[in-house]
């Protein structure tokens, strides 16, 4: 599969406990998000990185990689009866994907070793939500570590959607809306960030029942220019 490192918009490390409960207002619109960035509550990472995400609690612990995948990876879920146009337009107007979509894939044992090594460093975040689930994030920017993760993901088969199909459909539709706007403006190249969706990729063997979900606003992906 194709899964790449990306520049993330995320809470400032020392203000994450302030930011997460306020995500409803921070992500209510592009102006609010830009205000949070100007205030230092949120930050735009200058460089691309993978993020190792771990959640632990009941019923156990799962570890995944957060990366950007071609938006087509979100297709093929269950048929969506709900109209997702309003949600898609909100994402397109926000210009940011508010949380990673959850995907599962067949991981090799080598990937466990690589991610285990990444988790030996200091974590970027370690927060426990009201449900008692602890969310930890490690940033992977070192060239050799990024290369190792990318090589393993390149060899993995295509992932499967393990998220709300309506959310995935809204992300796909938002991508189409932004592409239509770019085509109408004569600026479309095919390389725009809206052609990718940020995803949390979990090994299928670790996921039983409901897959883990990265909290909204913790790791977001800018899909259009502010």
Feature map (PLM): residue ranges:
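Surface-exposed, charge/polar-rich loops and edge strands
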Residues: 1-161, 165-226
């Amino acid at each position: 599969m194709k899964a790449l490192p990306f520049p993330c918009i995320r809470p400032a490390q020392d203000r994450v406990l302030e930011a997460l409960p306020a995500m409803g207002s921070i992500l209510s619109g592009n102006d609010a998000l830009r205000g949070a960035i100007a205030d230092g509550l949120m930050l735009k990472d200058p460089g691309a990185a993978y993020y190792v995400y771990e959640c632990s609690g009941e019923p156990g612990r799962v570890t995944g990689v957060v990366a950007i995948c071609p938006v087509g990876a979100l297709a093929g879920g269950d048929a969506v009866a709900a109209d997702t146009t309003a949600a898609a337009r909100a994402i397109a107007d926000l210009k940011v994907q508010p949380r990673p979509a959850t995907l599962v894939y067949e991981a090799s044992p080598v990937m466990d070793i690589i991610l285990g090594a990444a988790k030996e460093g200091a974590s970027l975040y370690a927060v426990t939500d009201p449900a008692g689930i602890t969310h930890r994030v490690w940033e992977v920017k070192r060239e050799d570590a990024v290369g190792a993760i990318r090589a393993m993901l390149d060899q993995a088969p295509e992932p499967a959607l393990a998220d709300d199909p309506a959310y995935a459909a809204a992300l796909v539709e938002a991508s189409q809306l932004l592409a239509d706007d770019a085509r109408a403006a004569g600026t479309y190249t095919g390389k725009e960030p809206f052609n990718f969706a940020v995803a949390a990729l979990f090994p299928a063997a670790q996921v039983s029942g409901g897959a883990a979900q990265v909290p909204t606003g913790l790791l977001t992906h800018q899909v259009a220019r502010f």
